[in-house]
Each structure stands twice: as C-alpha cells, then as structure tokens.
Regions:
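Mid-domain Rossmann-like dinucleotide-binding core that forms the NAD(H)/NADP(H) cofactor-binding site
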Residues: 150-237, 311-351
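Hydrophobic beta-strand signal
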Residues: 49, 80, 90-92, 180, ...
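A short acidic, Gly/Pro-enriched loop at the edge of an enzyme's catalytic core
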Residues: 241-250, 353-363
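NAD(P)H dinucleotide-binding glycine-rich loop of Rossmann-like/cofactor-binding domains
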Residues: 33, 95-182, 196
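Cytochrome P450 core scaffold surrounding the K-helix E-X-X-R motif
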Residues: 60-65
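Glycine-rich beta-strand-centered segment in the early N-terminal region that forms part
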Residues: 34-55, 66-110, 147-149
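Glycine-rich phosphate-binding loop and adjacent beta-alpha segment
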Residues: 257-319, 324-351, 368-420
Length: 420
C-alpha cells in the first residue's frame, strides 16, 4: 500500500502560503489524504500516486482565492510527474469517472463531456493536492507518458498548450478571418502557437487566416511573432488606437476583468473568453462560471430559422429555460420544450430529467441578472442551469447596463469560452 508523508505549502484564503503536514495512503481501491493529523479527503478508486517533478504557474493559480472552491489547498495543475519507475507523465487535470477508468452511468461522461462531469475533482484547483507539493494523486486514465525526446521544460507546457489548442478549435476560425489575441503572456502566447498550428492545417486545404497579437509591453511583440503571430501591435490598456470592430474575432487571454470591454469593442463577430479570474466584468458576476461550463452568449434569433442554428443538441425539441417576464414568441414552443419559472426552480426540474443531460440545452435572458442566473441559479451552489457548451440567448433590453449584452443584441456579437 503506498504511504507517503510530506510537507507542502497550502495556499490559503488570506492569499498567503502556510506549511502543512500531509500523509497519503491507499491503493487502487481508494486513497485517504490526511492533513496536519486529521482526515482531509477520501477518494474512491481510479487514482495513482505520482511524484511531482515540475509544475508551471498559471493565471488560475494567481486568481485561486477568487474561485468558488474551498481553501486551503496545495495548488498547481500544470504538472510533470514521475511514477515509481521514474517514467515521466503529464496529467489531464479533471478527475471524472471517465478519467478514473470507472464504468459509470454518468450522462456527462457518456455524452463525450468528461471534463464537465459534475462528480469530478480537479488537480490543484478543486480538492486534489496539486503540483506545488512533492506528491499528487492523478486519475489513472489521464496520465499521458512523455516521449524521451521531449525535455522537461516543454513537457510542463503540455497542459496549458492543450487548453490553448482547445480554445483555437472552439473558436473555429474562418477563411480570411483577422484574429486578435489580447494580452498574450503565458497562456496567450500558447494560444498564438495553437492558432498557428490550426492555420498550418488549414493552409494545406487552401484556407488561411491572420493572427495579430495586441501587447502593452514592446518586449512581448517579438516573442508573439516567434510563437506564430503575423503581426504584433503595441497598444495602451484600452487599445484606444484601434477602431471598433477592427478584428473578426478577439481572444481575451489577459486574466484581467477590465479587458473584456476592450475585446467586445474590437471584435466584429466573436469574443472568445479564456480567463477565469473570478471577478465581475461588463455587468456580469458569473463569467468564471460561464468559462468553467464553456458556455456561449448569442443574440436571440428573430425567427425560427435562426433558432435552429443556436441548438447544441441532437434532440428535435431541446429543453429551453425561458427567464424573461415577457412571453416567448409563438413559433418557439413548436421547436423547443419551453420551461418557465424561477431559475433555481427550473434547475431542479431539469436535474430530475430521466433522459439526456440533466440540464437545459439553452436559456433565454433579457438582462445581466438573468444571464448570471442562467449560469449559476443559486449563487452559493456551483450547479448550473444550462448544459456544458450550451448557449444563453440574449434578448434586447433597454436597461441591460452591460456593454457586452448591448453588443450581442445590437450588432449580433457572440461570446464563446473555453477552459482546460
């Protein structure tokens, strides 16, 4: 039975680090984590004990105190680790049923959404001790061996690069697009590299798109070009040198809540949000939940034909949570199962559904408060109303008080999102 005792630095709710004494014991049937002599965490089967070799520092680590998960915790999730034979592994951080190799009837794991499994724990972010300590517990089917010709310095970037590549694929650049990466530093440079890789694939089929890095530090301009940007432009903190709609799509990698308004102004068609900073922005309080669930905000369609394009389900009649006081249009009930009521009550209804994901496929909102409620119906609970990678359709409102929602309803902007 593996049994290790070690000291590690916990990150605390006071935004400081404090030493703690840990013990991990268990085997393939399950592990117990002890902290300062007290039982801290009980884990079922599907984990393996690894020794941390290196760990990157992510903006999520820097914003950890804003996230809705308990502290203290040993943080760090960009991990390179060793097994008992000294073999190197990188780790996909979401400990879902799928990642733990468990035969389970979880509808999320069965639907190709294991990174959104509600029962998952997340390495270095939610419960599981992370790579800033000497030992960690990783899901058995999420440990990827590192080839011998890949150095440690590159291997430790695999997890954040996977997140960057996921963003590039979620964005789905179109031929001829002019894309901007706003605020590239750690993650943003990897997003540029991922876009360059996607563009290389597209060029083989005769398609192309442009990538511009928007930086505040001139020293980052050359680095951005090295990572694959066609051009790098030095801008002020609001990119005031650039006109509205200067780019087809803007990827916000800043980790700064104030930058979203800049991205909204610069984007003609779409903003892709890649920041989980845990703070309010553009009048919305639940943007981190939106990114965690990889949701999309889009304009409510004017007719039935536009509605079909908004659906993310194969169901002929998707479940739709209608939150505005005004009645839905007459054409909608024929195309969706329209649920009306308070958001927390609707969330309870869809959770009891015997078929498909226990979530609404879409929601309709007419205010920032309704968008927040669609993301997290109960602010003290992480249970969402809308399914992962679902869509919240925004109706026009004269009192939205949100530049983001105004842009969605007045010029058909979309906000998409992704995480690791």
């Amino acid at each position: 039975m593996p049994n290790v005792t070690f000291e590690a630095l916990d990150y605390t709710g006071e935004r400081t680090f404090a030493p703690a004494r840990y013990r991990i014991d268990g085997d393939a049937r399950g592990f117990t984590v002890w902290r300062n002599g007290a039982r801290w965490l009980e884990l079922g089967p599907g984990y393996r004990l690894l020794r941390a070799r290196a760990c990157g520092v992510c903006s999520t680590d820097l914003a950890r105190h804003h996230l809705p998960f308990p502290l203290p915790q040993v943080i760090g999730h960009e991990v390179l680790a060793l097994d008992e034979r000294g073999e190197r592994y990188v780790v996909e951080i979401n400990a879902s049923h799928h990642a733990r190799g468990l035969a389970d009837d979880c509808p999320f794991c069965r639907s190709g959404l294991p990174t959104h499994c509600p029962a998952r724990r997340t390495l270095g972010i939610h419960d599981l001790p992370g790579g800033f300590g000497p030992w960690l517990l990783a899901p058995i089917d999420a440990c990827l061996p590192v080839p011998a010709n890949v150095p440690d310095s590159a291997a430790v970037l695999v997890e954040p690069f996977a997140a960057a590549l996921h963003a590039a694929r979620r964005l789905q650049p179109r031929a001829g697009d002019r894309l901007a990466v706003l605020g590239p530093r750690r993650l943003g440079m990897l997003v540029i590299a991922a876009l360059a890789g996607v563009r290389g694939e597209r060029r083989q089929g005769g398609e192309d798109f442009g990538v511009v890095a928007l930086v505040r530090d001139p020293q980052l301009a050359a680095m951005a070009r090295t990572f694959g940007a066609d051009r790098a432009q030095v801008v002020d903190d609001r990119a005031s040198e650039l006109p509205e709609g200067a780019f087809d799509a803007v990827i916000d990698t800043t980790g700064n809540p104030e930058a979203l308004a800049t991205a909204v102004r610069l984007a003609r068609r779409e903003v892709h949000l890649k920041s989980t900073h845990g703070q309010s922005s553009c009048g919305l309080r639940q943007l981190t939940g939106l990114v965690v669930d990889e949701l999309t905000l889009a304009p409510f369609p004017v007719d039935a034909s536009g509605f079909e394009a908004s659906c993310v389900t194969d169901s002929e009649r998707p479940r739709l949570a209608w939150l505005p006081d005004a009645a839905p249009p007459a054409w909608l009930p024929a195309r969706a199962e329209v649920l009306r009521g308070a958001p927390e009550a609707l969330a309870a209804v869809v959770r009891r559904s015997p078929h498909g994901l226990p979530r609404a496929d879409l929601a309709v909102a007419a205010s920032a408060a309704e968008v927040d409620a669609a993301i997290r119906p109960v602010t003290t609970n992480e249970a969402p109303l809308v399914r992962p990678r679902g869509t919240i359709l925004v109706q026009s409102s004269p009192t939205s008080a949100s530049p983001l929602l105004d842009a969605i309803t007045s010029r058909s902007l979309r906000l998409s999102s992704s995480r690791c």
